[in-house]
Regions:
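N-terminal hydrophobic targeting signals that begin at the initiator methionine
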Residues: 1-3
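Helical membrane-embedded segments and adjacent short helical loop/helix-boundary regions
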Residues: 5-86, 91-102, 106
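Transmembrane alpha-helical segments of multi-pass membrane transport proteins and ion-pumping complexes
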Residues: 16-29, 46, 50, 54, ...
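Generic secondary-structure signature for well-ordered alpha-helical cores
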Residues: 31-35, 57, 150, 174-179, ...
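Membrane-interfacial segments
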Residues: 34-38, 59-60, 64, 90, ...
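Residue-level detector of alpha-helical segments with a strong bias toward transmembrane helices
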Residues: 50, 67, 98, 147, ...
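Internal active-site segments that recognize and position negatively charged phosphoryl groups
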Residues: 88-160, 164
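Alpha-helical membrane segments and immediately flanking helix-loop junctions
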Residues: 127-154, 158-161, 176, 180-218
Length: 235
């Protein structure tokens, strides 16, 4: 049965895309039905895909090739986050200095936490380079990690986990530290948890979503510039 399924899938160029979309749709449905943040569609979708590939004994390499079109949509999807930002352009202009300062500090904290973890765990340069761009969107982080000598595929997994944790804790952290300003919420979430966190920010409000989308772009640029400097701190 498994061999028949493998033969069927090998003859279909789009099965990886269909599997990915179906897994995410099922995860989104469960998230909507339960209303629990822990049932994140991205997390559930990833688990469903892993289970399917494991049960059917389908090599990940085959899935990766078939699902490649989904990867091509990462950059356009990230760019599309500029739409809510454009709708709040006046608010951005009024608070430009505070927003840029917040994103800059958040980026430095992210890089600093990676350095502290690397020193505490005595990570190698390769491991540190893999961990360093953990808080920026996959479209940027994997390229940065590869350029620095890290393991890009592992970076992608770390980025996803970072985003999911950020999305899960976003509202709790805001309540804990009495953060009520929507701009501050959006900047914090976008800088720390990239696109996955931004999906949560959009649920919290239009301003939060717009500021989070901006933070992804600015934090991505700052991280790409600063990572080559930071990686040299580990011998």
């Amino acid at each position: 049965m498994t061999q028949l399924l493998n033969d069927f899938l090998s003859g279909s160029a789009a099965w990886g895309v269909l599997l990915t979309l179906a897994a995410f749709a099922l995860g989104a449905l469960i998230n909507k039905m339960t209303g629990k943040a822990i049932f994140n569609p991205l997390l559930l979708g990833s688990i469903f895909v892993i289970v399917f590939l494991s049960v059917c004994k389908i090599p990940y390499a085959d899935y990766k090739i078939s699902a490649a079109p989904v990867n091509y949509l990462l950059l356009p999807a990230t760019v599309a986050l500029a739409i809510p930002l454009y709708e709040k352009i006046d608010l951005l202009k009024e608070n430009a200095a505070a927003i840029i300062a917040g994103i800059s500090v958040g980026t430095l904290v992210s890089l600093g936490s990676a350095l502290a973890l690397a020193l505490a765990l005595d990570l190698t340069r390769e491991q540190y380079a893999t961990l360093l761009p953990k808080s920026v969107t996959t479209a940027i982080s994997m390229d940065v990690a590869a350029e620095l000598g890290g393991i890009a595929a592992l970076t992608g997994a770390i980025v996803i986990v970072t985003g999911i944790v950020g999305a899960l804790l976003a509202e709790t952290v805001c309540k804990l530290f009495h953060i009520t300003d929507p701009i501050a919420k959006g900047v914090g979430i976008g800088t720390a948890a990239h696109a996955v966190g931004t999906s949560k920010a959009l649920q919290m409000g239009e301003v939060e979503g717009a500021m989070s989308g901006l933070s992804i772009a600015v934090a991505g640029v700052l991280t790409a510039v600063l990572c080559p400097v930071c990686v040299n701190l580990i011998n």
